[in-house]
């Protein structure tokens, strides 16, 4: 998969911009706060229908305008597909080849983002690892994002109801309606997470083994708040969720919190049997993160026969030189990649003949050289 052309109107600090990227490596350089990350955000938005850093669509629109247009041409499976996003206050519309389509059509397009925040994936909170997992599930399982949003909505309403019951403003019988929905949607979320991990973990283990020269073995395990046996069906997870929740009902009423479910789960990562979060060095933790990110590329390829687009937002030079070379070796001439950086660090020599260098200045994009 390749982004062939990107045109922007009123996106962040880009009032009008056109970008015809190299099919392999694109290094986007320039001073801070000039629009490097904005360009990656535009690519991400065009392929996923949302921003990776703004909560509201209005935030991506240039402050002097009330609308944004993103036009993208993508080569996918030997087909040229034209995407257009029109974003206005309170609405956004997607068109594919001139025909208005639902956002679910974007499941065809793959994009993997690697940003500085990802480097804290291992030592960060369980929420960060759940976010990583949910993003991966969402790219491979159509409708998952909507499923998760529905679960989160049910969870919020159930927690509010627990407080009302504790304060004698609602009856406990009302909880049963929300319980059934919580178990049903929660079981679906857990089941889909486990199915994707079943595919992702073997690839990540193989990748990590190669990145470390065969000296480290990566182990990954889904840590559920429920006691789950391996290989359970969605229906069996539902039953475990239901029976386990009923046993702690009084504790939940006391705390006014839902104490079981996918919102409490985590992903355990270990190196040679030792927990990476607590005992891994910074270099080891970053290698685990790199292994997980590269495995996303390979899993997409295994599932769809093409590599997704890779966005490296100011992260390449956060890795040491050996890991930089490992990453470049993995993607060179295989994965269309967009790299933002304030300085190139001599990386041009590593990818000579397979990319373009771009300069961004105050929302203006110019090609500097081919290397």
UniProtKB/Swiss-Prot annotation:
ATP binds at residues 30-37. SUPFAM superfamilies: P-loop containing nucleoside triphosphate hydrolases (SSF52540). Pfam families: SMC_N. The keyword Ribonucleoprotein does not apply. InterPro entries: DNA-binding_RecF (IPR001238), DNA-binding_RecF_CS (IPR018078), P-loop_NTPase (IPR027417), RecF/RecN/SMC_N (IPR003395), RecF_2 (IPR042174). Keywords: ATP-binding, Cytoplasm, DNA damage, DNA repair, DNA replication, DNA-binding, Nucleotide-binding, SOS response. It is found in: Cytoplasm. Coiled coil: none annotated. GO terms for molecular function: ATP binding; single-stranded DNA binding. GO terms for biological process: DNA replication; DNA synthesis involved in DNA repair; double-strand break repair; SOS response. PROSITE patterns: RECF_1, RECF_2. GO terms for cellular component: cytoplasm. Gene3D superfamilies: P-loop containing nucleotide triphosphate hydrolases, RecF/RecN/SMC, N-terminal domain. Its main location: cytoplasm. PANTHER family: DNA REPLICATION AND REPAIR PROTEIN RECF (PTHR32182:SF0). The RecF protein is involved in DNA metabolism; it is required for DNA replication and normal SOS inducibility. RecF binds preferentially to single-stranded, linear DNA. It also seems to bind ATP. HAMAP family: RecF. Belongs to the RecF family. This is DNA replication and repair protein RecF. It comes from Desulforamulus reducens (strain ATCC BAA-1160 / DSM 100696 / MI-1). The lineage of its organism: Bacteria, Bacillati, Bacillota, Clostridia, Eubacteriales.
């Amino acid at each position: 998969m390749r982004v062939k052309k990107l045109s922007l109107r009123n996106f962040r600090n880009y009032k009008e911009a056109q970008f015809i990227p190299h099919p392999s490596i694109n290094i986007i350089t320039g001073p801070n706060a000039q629009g490097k990350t904005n360009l990656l955000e535009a690519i991400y938005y065009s392929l996923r229908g949302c921003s990776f850093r703004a909560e509201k669509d209005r935030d991506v629109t240039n402050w002097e305008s009330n609308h944004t247009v993103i036009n993208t041409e993508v080569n996918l499976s030997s087909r040229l597909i034209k995407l257009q996003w029109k974003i206005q206050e309170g609405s956004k519309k997607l068109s594919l080849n001139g025909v208005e389509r639902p956002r679910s059509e974007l499941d065809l397009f793959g994009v993997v983002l690697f940003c500085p925040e990802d480097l804290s994936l291992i030592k960060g909170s369980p929420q960060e690892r759940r976010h990583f997992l949910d993003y991966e599930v969402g790219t491979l399982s159509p409708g998952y994002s909507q499923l998760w949003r529905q679960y989160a909505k049910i969870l919020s309403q159930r927690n509010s109801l627990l407080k009302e019951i504790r304060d004698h403003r609602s009856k406990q019988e009302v909880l049963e309606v929300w319980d059934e929905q919580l178990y049903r949607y929660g079981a679906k979320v857990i089941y889909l997470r486990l199915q994707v991990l079943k595919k992702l973990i073997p690839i990540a283990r193989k990748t990590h083994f190669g990145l470390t020269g065969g000296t480290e073995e990566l182990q990954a395990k889904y840590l559920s708040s429920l006691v789950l046996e391996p290989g359970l069906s969605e229906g069996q997870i539902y039953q475990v969720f239901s029976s386990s929740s009923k046993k702690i009902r009084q504790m939940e009423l006391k705390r006014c919190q839902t104490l079981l479910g996918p919102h409490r789960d985590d992903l355990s990562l270990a190196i040679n049997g030792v927990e990476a979060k607590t005992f891994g060095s910074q270099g080891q933790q970053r290698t685990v993160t790199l292994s997980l990110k590269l495995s996303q590329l390979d899993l997409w390829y295994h599932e769809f026969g093409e590599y997704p687009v890779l966005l490296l937002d100011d992260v390449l030079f956060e890795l040491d030189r050996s890991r930089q070379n490992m990453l470049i070796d993995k993607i060179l001439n295989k994965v269309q990649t967009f790299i933002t950086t304030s300085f190139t660090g001599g990386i041009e020599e590593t990818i000579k003949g397979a990319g373009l260098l771009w300069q961004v200045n105050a929302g203006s994009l110019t090609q500097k050289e081919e290397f």
